[in-house]
Swiss-Prot record:
NDH-1 shuttles electrons from an unknown electron donor, via FMN and iron-sulfur (Fe-S) centers, to quinones in the respiratory and/or the photosynthetic chain. The immediate electron acceptor for the enzyme in this species is believed to be plastoquinone. Couples the redox reaction to proton translocation, and thus conserves the redox energy in a proton gradient. Cyanobacterial NDH-1 also plays a role in inorganic carbon-concentration. Residues 494-505 have a biased composition (Polar residues). It catalyses: a plastoquinone + NADH + (n+1) H(+)(in) = a plastoquinol + NAD(+) + n H(+)(out); a plastoquinone + NADPH + (n+1) H(+)(in) = a plastoquinol + NADP(+) + n H(+)(out). NDH-1 can be composed of about 15 different subunits; different subcomplexes with different compositions have been identified which probably have different functions. The gene is ndhB. It is found in: Cell inner membrane. Keywords: Cell inner membrane, Cell membrane, Membrane, NAD, NADP, Plastoquinone, Quinone, Translocase, Transmembrane, Transmembrane helix, Transport. This is NAD(P)H-quinone oxidoreductase subunit 2. It comes from Gloeobacter violaceus (strain ATCC 29082 / PCC 7421).
Amino acid sequence: MNIDLAALNAGTLWPEYIVTITLIVVLLVDLISGRKASWSLPYLALLGLGIATATLLPMWILENPVSFLGSFTADPLSVVFRAFILISAALTVLMSVRYINQSSLATAEFYVLLLGATLGAMLLSGSSEMAMIFVALELLSITSYLLSGYAKLDKRSNEASLKYLLIGAASSGIFLYGMSLLYGFSGGQTQLTEIAPRIVNLGFPALLSLVLVAAGICFKLSAVPFHQWTPDVYEGSPTPVVAFLSVGSKAAGFALAIRFMTSAYPGFSEQWQTLFVLLAILSMVLGNVVAIAQTSMKRMLAYSSIAQAGYVMIGLAIGTQEGYSSMILYIGTYLFMNLGAFMAVVLFSLRTGTDEITAYSGLYQKDPFLTLVLSLCLLSLAGIPPLAGFFGKLYLFWAAVQSQAYTLVFFGLVTSVASIYYYVRVVKLMLVKEPSPQVLAYSEAGDQDGIQTLKAGMLITTVATVVLGILFPPLISLADTSLRATPSLQQVRTATPVSRVSTGAQAPADHGR
């Protein structure tokens, strides 16, 4: 088969090329210079991630975003999610420098695996063909398994990696089986947009493939009931790895969910919207209720991430322009407030050796900066105004009200109120309680290598958590623009709102702007 190289439109993958080159450079520098140059590896990774982010900007206005014979689409939707993934990877690098030095872990391999996971997540965000989707998903998954077990001398890390691998392999098998059904039912098509018209009249067989594909995607989202791996993996894995999995991997999963559902299953929108309504409610309820009983900060944030996935799924479940726009905005704000919280946990655990919630008691007396960062990030996760998390949830609930999805709004509001308890409990401990033994023995290592990069990351995430709340109106316009410029999402302007499916309410005819 003759392939026109110009038709490949390979320039749309420049950010991915740069991440790949950075990965190779990190390997070569470590191979040639060894430990002498290990200090430079995180900064090389940061440089590469920064350049890759900069190369995304011109892609916002690409005339032809389709590349590699339809396997990859660099539309504005993928540009936004790839930017989220690159930013989360860069912030993970900032928080990992001191952590790796103090934990005596191999430096080069960590950044190579992190860049590999970043590459897989970016490719997954723009993939529009099933073979490409599976390859990108496995690249992200395999590097994530290795990262979760990176502290190989730690039994908890080994256990976390094994659980993640076994459950992840099962979910990949389920996802692949769902795609194989699609391949057969569509007469051998692998392009998502080509599959849709060929399965629209199939009925139950197509619904079976839909359920299997959704199950595989929901594993990446940590959505209930596919969440069992999350608490153990979050508790046992190195904290910087957990931070990336909670944001970068999840962002790629949501990008895949939007593209797969709107491109391959537009004729089954009522069915998959109803499915995601149930998953969103289960995730919000279980995540927030179980988080209340946690005594470990990392396990609490694990269940918090399950609940946060439920909130984001509100936008996916209602299936309108406003819903997808609110998803994008909430993921963007969640990126900074969640990574900021994990950075604070990293710094505290490095100085005390524990992540128990009670150990944070009286922290304000010893470290006001750390207390401020963690408090603002937790309050933003709780949805307290005027922080970014409040406006993100407000826009999600507003989009649900516009679609008359009152059941989702009810559960979202009730669980948000419940979440305030376990977030504010930590803030109260730090501010008004007597110092714990760990805080009394707290050692500030301000002159240690890597602490300043960690503090810089904490400052960036905290400022973003506050400022994004102030800049929310222009961000809404940006998200709406990205959706209007994405061809595969044009049909959702007149999509049936979820309320007509779940409550039987009369829905407005058009939610387009």
